[in-house]
UniProtKB/Swiss-Prot annotation:
Its main location: cytoplasm. InterPro entries: HPr, HPr-like, HPr-like_sf, PTS_HPr_His_P_site. It comes from Shewanella violacea (strain JCM 10179 / CIP 106290 / LMG 19151 / DSS12). Belongs to the HPr family. This is Phosphocarrier protein NPr.
Length: 91
């Protein structure tokens, strides 16, 4: 099975905080894919809010999205769009 990889920069003011992590985890869970988020030496399942929070990803940090599974391409597209939209937050 092919593994896909994308990079995206966190651009919202508060970074990957609880509300943003929850939105990302809910979105990732909607796809038939295993998505892993990597930031530096840390990695977490995109479906785990706690794991995402433990990445301690702030504004300006670049994360790598790794995906595998039937819907991996669509999942990575959707997650990149969410991050680029600043998790639908005002800042």
């Amino acid at each position: 099975m092919t593994k896909l990889e994308r990079q995206v920069t966190i651009c919202n003011k508060l970074g990957l905080h609880a509300r943003a992590a929850t939105k990302l985890a809910i979105l990732a869970s909607e796809f038939d894919a295993e998505i892993t988020i990597v930031q530096g030496e840390k990695k977490a399942s995109a479906a785990s809010v706690l794991g995402l929070l433990m990445l301690e990803t702030g504004m300006g940090k670049t994360i790598t999205l790794l995906g595998k599974g039937q819907d991996a391409d669509a999942a990575l597209d959707a997650i990149c769009a969410l991050v680029d939209a600043k998790f639908d937050e005002a800042s």
